[in-house]
Every structure is written in structure tokens, then in C-alpha cells.
């Protein structure tokens, strides 16, 4: 018998003859304090995210490529990493084609091993989509895919994230229910509230130690 089997056996034996406690979970108790109207969600999300140094911009489905281009110029960023086969990647490619003076585009379209040095040392910014956000906690929901892997939102020092206003949920319970995570947990979903930060024993706060030093969220007011 393995150590694992031995431990589980002891746990099962200890439960013999016991009666499970009824589950008195109260949905309203968990969700009512963290439920918002459509008009409240963006201000609530913005307040919490800006408190941890996230930069928020309100824009539109038509205007966000031009806004992104201006933000890149303002920060003097020489290039932007995109996922070219995503809808937002295609929008950026089209906008850039009509404005050849913009910073260079880099495509995440090959295995990381083929351009690891460039990705880690010469890729200053990236753009990804999001699955939505949670107003109650001020968090983006990132959902890495084969087209848009986790390294895109982790490695470049500046991460631009697109968020549709209609996809801002009230609370984490609503997200779990809507996506039916109880039936099968996602392999790599992330909740991100701000840029990477850490502090040493002297409580000196530093940004960018374990991820982007800047998080810039473009909220598309599509509702």
C-alpha cells in the first residue's frame, strides 16, 4: 500500500458512522453585496484597478485601434506583439496597414523556442483580449489560448488588454456559474488586477519583477 492510499484509507475510516452536514449555502448572502447595475460596473472596476496602478481608458469598438496607436507613440514603444489570427489582431493589422508610420508589429505565430531571446529581451509591449472582468474585485479574466498563449501577457513589460464593457460581471460566483466551471475547471484561467509587483523585507515596492510593469486596459463601451 502506498503512502497516499494509506492516508486516504485512514481518512475514510475516520468518517465511518458520521453524518454529513447539510449544505446551507446562501447564494444571496454571497452575491447581494457584490451586485451592481450596468452603470455601476465600469466605475467599480476602474476604482479598484486604478488603486493598484492599472491604467484605464474608455473607448469604442471603432476607435480603440487609433487609441492604442496613440498610447504606443506616447510611451515611445518601438513595437507591439499581437496574435495575428484573433479578431483584434486582424483589426490591428488592418489599421497599421493604413498607417505605415506606426510602431512595428510582431506576430506570435511560431514556437517560443524559435525566438525566445527576442521575446524576452526585445519585445516591449503586447496586446491581448480578455474573457471579461469582475467588478467586485477589480479583476480581468485572462484566458490564454493556442493563438494567444500566457507568455503574451506575462513577458512584455507593457501589457495592453482589451475588455468589452458588456463582459464585465458582478462577482466571481456569477463567472463560475456562467461558464459552468463546476462541470470542468479551466486549465489556465487567470484573474489579474494590476501590474506585477513585489516587495522586499524592507517593504520597498517594485513593479515588473514577475510580469509586466504596466497594465493598460482599453474598455470598449459596447453596450
Which residues fall in each region the model found?
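The feature marks the mature, well-folded catalytic cores of soluble enzymes
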Residues: 1-223
Amino acid at each position: 500500500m502506498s503512502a497516499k492510499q494509506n492516508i486516504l484509507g485512514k481518512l475514510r475510516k475516520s468518517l465511518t458512522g458520521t453524518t454529513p452536514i447539510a449544505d446551507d449555502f446562501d447564494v444571496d448572502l454571497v452575491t447581494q453585496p457584490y451586485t451592481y447595475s450596468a452603470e455601476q460596473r465600469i466605475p467599480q472596476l476602474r476604482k479598484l484597478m486604478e488603486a493598484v496602478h492599472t491604467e484605464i481608458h474608455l473607448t469604442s469598438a471603432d476607435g480603440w485601434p487609433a487609441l492604442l496607436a496613440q498610447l504606443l507613440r506616447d510611451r515611445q514603444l518601438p513595437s507591439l506583439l499581437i496574435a495575428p489570427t484573433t479578431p483584434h489582431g486582424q483589426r490591428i493589422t488592418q489599421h497599421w496597414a493604413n498607417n505605415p508610420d506606426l510602431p512595428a508589429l510582431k506576430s506570435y505565430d511560431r514556437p517560443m523556442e524559435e525566438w525566445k531571446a527576442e521575446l524576452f529581451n526585445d519585445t516591449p509591449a503586447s496586446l491581448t483580449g480578455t474573457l471579461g472582468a469582475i467588478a467586485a474585485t477589480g479583476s480581468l479574466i485572462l484566458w490564454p489560448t493556442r493563438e494567444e498563449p500566457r507568455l503574451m501577457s506575462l513577458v512584455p513589460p507593457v501589457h495592453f488588454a482589451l475588455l468589452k464593457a458588456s463582459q464585465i460581471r458582478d462577482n466571481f460566483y456569477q463567472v463560475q456559474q456562467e461558464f459552468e466551471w463546476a462541470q470542468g475547471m479551466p486549465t489556465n484561467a487567470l484573474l489579474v488586477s494590476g501590474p506585477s509587483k513585489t516587495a522586499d523585507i524592507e517593504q520597498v515596492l517594485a513593479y515588473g519583477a514577475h510580469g509586466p510593469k504596466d497594465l493598460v486596459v482599453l474598455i470598449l463601451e459596447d453596450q
